Amino acid sequence: MVPPTAVNDAPAAGSAVSVKDPAKDTILTPRFYTTDFEAMAAMDLRPNEAELEAICEEFRKDYNRHHFVRNDEFEGAADKLDPETRRVFVEFLEQSCTSEFSGFLLYKELSRRIKTRNPLLAECFAHMARDEARHAGFLNKSMSDFGLQLDLGFLTANKSYTFFQPKFIFYATYLSEKIGYWRYITIFRHLEKNPDSKIFPIFNFFENWCQDENRHGDFFDALMKAQPNTVRGFRARLWCRFFLLAVFATMYVRDVARKEFYEALGLDARDYDRLVIDKTNETTARVFPVVLDVKNPKFYAGLENLVTNNAALDAVDASASSAPIKVLRKLPHWIANGAQMASLFLMAPVRSESFQPSVR
């Protein structure tokens, strides 16, 4: 497996590539995770071992081994973008590269730490680390077309790592992979119908790319079924609702805040996110015992309140006020966000067996 930092990123002759400072950490930026490796090593896979072995066999085939090969379309493509489109597209590349690299680090460390005690699980994580490394390297190479690159080694050493228990890793990464599938395939299908909106050739790779995300999500689906306590019982239902809400709300607020990127692709950020949320919610019903009632008008009304509060927080950040004054000015918006998230969490969920009986 080639780590992202080892991808051939040499700039063309006569060009200069600068190392881009990492984006400031906020609640909306991609997180780096670590977990209880001892608990992962001791995990009993027997309740669903056959399905996990079948998924591992799919990983071994490495369908996209020869997919991520740049072609002549990339030559000069960056020069065709106007300054504002360049700005929002580079931001998209940075966020996506950071997210993929975060997955690589987690999966690679898991595969290394549990290899001797849980070889099947370790092999699955090694294959997924391979995919994430490939994605991150491809994105970082595209950044070099704009004269910038992320120092992935620096990110490894200096990013803050959030500790999650294994079951929380399962919820978060399952949703991340499945929502990634729906995000990529939705953009690909839109641009297939509207080729004039394809601002950069990287989008040509999204159809096969999203299948990696889908297979990774299927792996975590099977892994949760091998650990029935993660998807059964009252507490499991609460955690499933919490992670669904956290992932959907974060994506919606972030995407509306950078709606200019989606406009450059001929998409409306809100419509795009609603479609992705609907599809991800439906897919999640295959494993989670409950899903969110995203058809309830109160759901998106609540997300819009979060968007408004987030915009107000950004305005405070951009002001010339002193740090203590900024905290005081932010306090009511933080409280409003907390109250709104609590209200959304307390909305009645939809039981998965009634929501999607055909797949259960």
From Swiss-Prot:
GO terms for molecular function: iron ion binding; magnesium-protoporphyrin IX monomethyl ester (oxidative) cyclase activity. CDD domains: ACSF. Keywords: Chlorophyll biosynthesis, Iron, Metal-binding, NADP, Oxidoreductase, Photosynthesis. Its EC number is 1.14.13.81. Its cofactor is Fe cation. Pathway: Porphyrin-containing compound metabolism; chlorophyll biosynthesis (light-independent). It comes from the Bacteria. It is an enzyme of class 1 (oxidoreductase). Pfam families: Rubrerythrin (PF02915). Catalyzes the formation of the isocyclic ring in chlorophyll biosynthesis. Mediates the cyclase reaction, which results in the formation of divinylprotochlorophyllide (Pchlide) characteristic of all chlorophylls from magnesium-protoporphyrin IX 13-monomethyl ester (MgPMME). Belongs to the AcsF family. This is Magnesium-protoporphyrin IX monomethyl ester [oxidative] cyclase. It comes from Synechococcus sp. (strain WH7803).
